[in-house]
Amino acid sequence: MELDLHIHTNRYSGCSNIPPGEVIRSARAAGLDGIALTEHGIRWPDRDIADLLEKTGEKGFVVIAGEEVACFSSAGRFQGEFLVFGYPKSLGSSRAIEKVIELVHGEGGVVIAAHPFKPLETGSGYYGCGDAAWDLDIDGLEIEHPSYPEESRKLARKVMENRGLCGISCSDAHDLRGIGRFRTVFEAPVRDAAALCEAVRKRLIRNNI
């Protein structure tokens, strides 16, 4: 099963120009079996996803509610952005990553570092958790991302392999053309958030493309 697990729409993410009504059509056209909607700090309500599937006539298509959470330490230091799956509420974007991990794991969900080694456009460092990926109690990380140069791919794969974490490939799409640019191929069917969390924990990934 091929899923793109990092997509933003303009319903809840002001930085995206993807209309919700077009996201599934474009995902289908890209050959995907499913997607995750990961708005900034906001989890799509289940009823809204059900309505979206009904209106588009795509009830058999997999749409998973996740969110992308920006985290900050108690001192206000940016700690990176993280994809959350399996948590029933919107988390916002103000908590420390340690608290987010505690909350999400308490609900049986998973936390995946989003673009941990995405270089900043100016200066040094990363627009992600960077080397903290070696120590945080995360369940996985993005090993392929449109903004990764080759060095970032190598760093992400090194963390994945040495820590035994799940590695996923995501488009981080903010426009229709980006959907499915990168996707994760799962060994078994992933029909909902619970199955996704289980697959991440067991690293049931066949390939990242």
Segments the model singles out, each with a brief description of its role:
Residues M1, G31-G34, K59-V63, E107-V110, ...:
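Short, well-ordered coil/turn segments that N-cap beta-strands
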Residues M1-T9, S13, P19-S26, D46, ...:
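Charged catalytic cores and adjacent phosphate/nucleic-acid-binding surfaces used
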Residues D4, H8, I24-W44, I64, ...:
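Divalent metal-dependent hydrolysis catalytic cores, especially in the metallo-beta-lactamase
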Residues H40, E68, P116, A173:
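Short, ordered loop/turn segments at secondary-structure junctions
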Residues L52-T56:
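Alpha-helical transmembrane segments and their immediate juxtamembrane cytosolic regions
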Residues V63-V69:
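Two-metal-ion RNase H-like nuclease active-site motif
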Residues V110-E121:
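Aromatic-lined carbohydrate-recognition surfaces of secreted/lumenal glycan-active proteins
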